[in-house]
């Protein structure tokens, strides 16, 4: 399956919630009606969604939030199931620990897609070494920074300014003057923002 490159707001409308696919420069609720499905007048149906349909929608929503394709997502779930603890929470922690997501959480990219592009274009270093692998798992204590030659990019400066206004997650420590941050630890479930019901995904894969 190819990566979706169409209108981002349409995906959020389809899921009925903000998937944080667009920059925070303007509230998504101001741009489109999240309670209206895509289509000329919003698609409606009187039929009740099945349990399977609800579970599938939740999986699709999480895949879209993190920009992960089906095969990758299955691998993440298999790893989450193998680890000790709650499988659903493990899954979200693995997704949150992706380098592209950490770059986004540290405020170097205004969206996960932009953060992924920064990584792919070798604008990010981890512990002093350039990394261009968005799916790289960041570990506690790792230092993630913007390369010296990229620090003056307008999009990075703007993203960092917006992130500072909104506040950084507690599980990263960011020095905006140095354009670097430390991944302190994996986030707790309560630290992970977003309207996600990971138990539905566990139920889906347990069928």
UniProtKB/Swiss-Prot annotation:
InterPro entries: Ribosomal_uS4, Ribosomal_uS4_bac-type, Ribosomal_uS4_CS, Ribosomal_uS4_N, S4_RNA-bd, S4_RNA-bd_sf. Residues 97-158 form the S4 RNA-binding domain. It comes from the Bacteria. Residues 32-55 are annotated as: Disordered. It holds the Pfam family Ribosomal_S4. GO terms for biological process: ribosomal small subunit biogenesis; translation. Keywords: Ribonucleoprotein, Ribosomal protein, RNA-binding, rRNA-binding. One of its GO terms (cellular component) is small ribosomal subunit. Residues 42-53 have a biased composition (Polar residues). GO terms for molecular function: rRNA binding; structural constituent of ribosome. CDD domains: S4. One of the primary rRNA binding proteins, it binds directly to 16S rRNA where it nucleates assembly of the body of the 30S subunit. Part of the 30S ribosomal subunit. Contacts protein S5. The interaction surface between S4 and S5 is involved in control of translational fidelity. Belongs to the universal ribosomal protein uS4 family. NCBIfam families: PRK05327.1, rpsD_bact. This is Small ribosomal subunit protein uS4. It comes from Paraburkholderia phytofirmans (strain DSM 17436 / LMG 22146 / PsJN).
